[in-house]
Amino acid sequence: MLSAFAPSASAAAPAKPYDFNGDGYVDLAIGSPNGKVGKKAGAGFVSVIYGSAKGLNTAKKKVFTQNSKGIPGTAEAGDNFGYSLASADFDRDGYADLAIGAPGEDTAAGANAGTVTILWGTRSGLTTLAGSSAEFGDPGRNHRWGESLAVGDIQQDGSPELFITVPGTSMFKWFYFRPPAAASGAAVRPGAAMEPGGAKALPRRRGGVAAQSADDVNASWLATGDVTGDGHDDVVYAWHDADWPAPAERRGFVVLPGTAAGRLGDAVSVVFTEVKSLAVGDFNGDRRKDVAVGQSSAKGGRVAVFPGSASGVNSATRTVIDQDSPGVPGAGASGDGFGTAIAVGDVNKDGKADLAVGTPFDEVSGRKDAGRAYVLFGSASGLTGKGAQTVSQSTKGVPGASEKNDNFGFGVTLLDHTKDGRADLVVGAPRENGRDGAVTFFKSRGKAGFLPVLSVRAVGAGTFGVKGRNARLGGVLGR
C-alpha cells in the first residue's frame, strides 16, 4: 500500500533529494521505527532537521507520526513507521519529498502487510496537508511492503521512480510519478499521478541449488545508479536467505539495467556474496557507478567495491578494504562491525565519490561497542585506504564522550547540508543516553576531509522532544 499526499504543483527546477524546503541546503531525515507513540511501542516516527550555512539548524525541526494530522492511518504498536526512507522531488515542484516505509503496518490484507507514505515538500518544508490517498500493488500478510526504498530515474526522463521491496514475496516493485501540467494549478491527485511500473523477482538458485520458496528469501536492500554507463540508472538489488547466516549460494546482489522504455532488463550481473549494507558511487571518476557492499560479519568487518562497466560488475576486479588495509587508521578486531553502515558522497569536491563507513561495535577508549566512523576517499584507481580518516566521540572537538554501547557509527550519511558543494558527515549513535540516541554533524573541510574537526554539532532526543520514547536516533538515516 502506498499513500501520497500532495499540495499544488508549479513549474520549477527539481530540488535535490532531502531538500524539503527548496532552499538549496540538504535536510536530514531520521527514522525511529522502534519509537513509542503514545502508549504504542514500535509504532515509529520520523524526525526532520533542516540544513543551513552552519549545518544542521536545531531551531528548525519537525517530528512526524501516523497520528500527525494529514498522515494516513493511525500509530499502532509494531508498525515500524520510519523503518526506511527515500527522497526525490517526485512532483518536480522545486521541493524534495520524503517516502517513508512502515513494513510492520497491519492492513485489511493482513498483519505486517506494510505501507509506504509520501510527505510532500513545500517552501516551509515537509507538509502533511490533507488530501486523497492512493493504494498501489497488492501487499498481503507478512509481505512487509516498504522494508527498503530507493529512488532512481531508469528512463532518464527527469521523472524519478520509487522502488519498494516486498520481502515477503522476494520481489521489489516500482512506481512512476507523473506530475500534473504546471498550468493547471490544481492539487495533485495521487491516483492519477502514481503509476505502477513493474516488478522483479530475485534469483533463487546458483548452479545446482534448487530455487527456494518466497517465504525462505528476504529481499534486503536497494540502491540505484548508472553502473553500466549508458545514461540510465540501474537498480542494484541485494537479498539474503531468511535464515542468518545465509549459505553462500543464497545471498548476494544483482544489477538490473535501466532502459529508455522505463523497464528493467534482465540481470547483467549476479554476485553471490555477503551484503549487510549497500551503496553505489563513482569512486574512480570514470562516469560509471561502482557497487559498494558492507560485509560486517567478516572478522572486524570489511567493505567490498565492485567497479562498474558496460557489462555490469566483475567479482574478479573487486577491491576489499578493512581496518587493516594500508592507510586506514587503527586495527580490526573481531566483532567491530566495520561496514555495518555505508554512505556515498563527494567530501573534497574532486568529482570522485568517497565512502563513509560505520563501525558501531568498535571498542574506543576502553569502552566496548562505543563505535566510530571512517571516511575512505575515492581516487583515479578507485576507493582507497590512503588518507582515510576516523572520528569517534573521543575525537578532539566532538561533543560528549565515547561510552559503552553508544554504537556510534550505526548510521552514516554524506550529504551537503551547508550548500558549499562538499558532502558533510552525519554519524548516528542510536544507543546514546540509553535508547534515546543522537546524531553528530561534521562539516567538510574540503581536501582536508573532516580532521581536525572544524564544525561539529550533536543533536539528541531532547532537541526533538522525544526523550524516553525509544527513539534510537541515528539508527536509520535518509541518505
Regions from the PLM with identified roles:
Residues 34-39, 104-109, 168-171, 240-246, ...:
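Short glycine/acidic-enriched loop and turn motifs that connect beta-strands
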Residues 1-16, 50-80, 120-144, 176-217, ...:
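Blade-edge motifs of beta-propeller repeat domains
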Residues 218-311:
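Long, internal scaffold/assembly segments composed of regular secondary structure
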Residues 44-46, 59, 114-116, 170-172, ...:
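Repetitive beta-architecture junctions, highlighting loop-to-beta-strand starts
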